[in-house]
Amino acid sequence: IHKMLNPRSIAVVGASPKGGYGGRLLNALLRSKDRVNIYPVNPNYDEISGLKAYKSISDLPEAPDLMGVVVPYDKVLGVLKEGHAKGAGSAVIISAGFAERGTDSGLDLQRQVGAFARESGLRVAGPNCLGLANVRDDIWPTASSRTLGGLTGHIALVCQSGATAFGPFLLRAVDAGIGLSHIISTGNETDLDFSDFARYLIDDPGTRVVAGFVEGFKDVQKFIAMAKLAAERGKPIVLIKIGRSESGARAARSHTAALTGADSLYDAMFKQYGVIRVSDYDELLEVAQLFAYSRKPRKPGIAVVSHSDGINAILKNFGWAANPADVTGFARGQHFPTIMRHMIDEPTVGTLVVASAGGADQVPQVIAMRDNTEKNVAYFWTASRADKDTLTTLKKSHIPIFYTPQKLAQGLKSLLRYHAWQDDCVADGAAQVPKATEEQMSALTAFQNAGRSALSERESKEVITAWGVPAAREVRASSAGGAVEAAQKLGYPVALKVDSADILHKTEAGVVRLGLRTADEVRQAYDEITASAKRYAPDAVTAGVSVQEMVTGGVEVIIGIQYDAQLGPMLLFGSGGVMVEVFNDVALRHCPITPAEARRMIEEVKGAKLLRGFRGKPAADIDALAATLVRVSQMAVNLEGRIAELDINPLMVLPVGQGVKAVDALVVLKTLEV
């Protein structure tokens, strides 16, 4: 990657004097020909754009650090092999015609290119990309028609879409005066992907922020490892993740699946690993700029100085400007620096926001304040962007500029949350996953071997108890008399439920009876449940009923597992019970989690108030709940590839010191066609 981003010799394979991608790539590189050896390669020409053209890569006078490949797709693999034989350092494949065609042949060819890149060590960006740019050194190996100098800064832009990277992002960065260190389009990512480039940029001293535009990740574990390292190094990752639509989601068998959409899983993962997600091009650049040119806030307080009380009123609506000052009449006077100093020196203030139209005398005063304080300064521009002189001065000063109160508020919130998260992340350490024991795995193996799609409640509890999750005591009964005997053994009151893997949501089927206190009630409940089961699912296989102890005096919560095709195991926690999908009060995390992360999950849920004791109720055993969340997250990793979903709903969190008990559980096996 270093040679790719810092080349001193570049071969343009497929260079052309006729325009097109080959012509644009060569023309973009001509600006750096005084610093980089540029070699056009095309057997049909002796000279292109004033440079000697070569018949083949083998004819080059040196092994190029980078090959820009612009040849028909069926010639690309041959070019890579020839380049490898020459000793080329890397390649950017502009050529299209691979997996994006949607054909088996295109996908197969792309796989061959990727396999060769990994086996040979000739690392590849693309195919189907627009190239890249080392903006800092003004080297632009890109087939984009847009190349601009003088835009140097500390933000690296990595996009899976080349048209987006060199189109709206580049144009907006120029318009906003936001400098970049690199622009990288990754295309189809047959070899190097977003995470690889971001990992390299974490080590780049000239890059302070990695900004990205992605649709998905080839290797989520690699992305997570990169994000963790970025947090340790203090380099924020700011992303637009497209594809928020939930269309095409599979039918949900468990409550957990119904409560989690694909996009909510990404949101949870980003939050867990400190990735700042934004919504649009402007927000990405403005937030990245704020991080690139701001320190860690010493205090969370934000002071706002404005020439308009109306602007202050607008900013107050966003909930973070507690002390706005209307300085009408002083905004352009000699007293303005004193006012700013008074505001920024407040002990609770970590950031000063100046909201103004940017007068010619005021802007230098704001810049001077930024240069003479260790606190952060940002600017909310309230005038027309056509007022170029003072706005240009602000841009050149690298004071973060925002143009809407919404994006200003979002940016400042992101800054505060990121640094708070970073402190927590460093303190947490790594999540642990003990290797599953033979006894734990055998709890599931028998059911899988039987070709089952889901487990009954009783069977599901056998699985979770193997991972240390306590469950309510129960006895299976196949007759009304047997149910009475079981109830007497457990002690009244009891609950009766049908024992069947074919009836997953028992409340809906009418096959649950609670709080039974006498033998007569148990007999009646048995008859009603068996009749209801036959009406609800005539073909269901049942094994009688499960007679369970009634667990009372606790708070109902749900813990669940879902496996995403890209993200892997995800853990859900929320307020539980039969209304769980109505309230949708949940927190999500990627598995495994640390004990501290478990407690943060608990605090995210509105129902956490009930756990702390509410209206005279005793406080619940939050320590036991947090430990259970950790164990279930470890279980999720251990059972990846073997189960599809897990619900523990409800899990009763009993008063402090009494632990937790699973009252109901559902395991959906991986073999289920969904």
Task: Enumerate the language-model features and the residues they cover.
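Hydrophobic, well-ordered beta-alpha structural blocks that scaffold small-molecule cofactor pockets
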Residues: I1-R35, P40-N42
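General beta-strand structural signal in soluble alpha/beta enzymes
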Residues: Y39-V41, A91-I93, A117-R118, R123-N128, ...
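Phosphate-bearing ligand-interacting subdomains
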Residues: K52-F116, F213-D219
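Active-site nucleotide/adenylate-binding loops and adjacent lid/helix of ATP-dependent enzymes
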Residues: S144, D282, A288-S294, V433-V555, ...
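Short glycine-cluster motifs
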Residues: R146-D203, G248-A251, K271, R298-G350, ...
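ATP-dependent carboxylate activation and anion-phosphoryl transfer catalytic cores
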Residues: T260-G261, R277, K388-T392, K396-Y403, ...
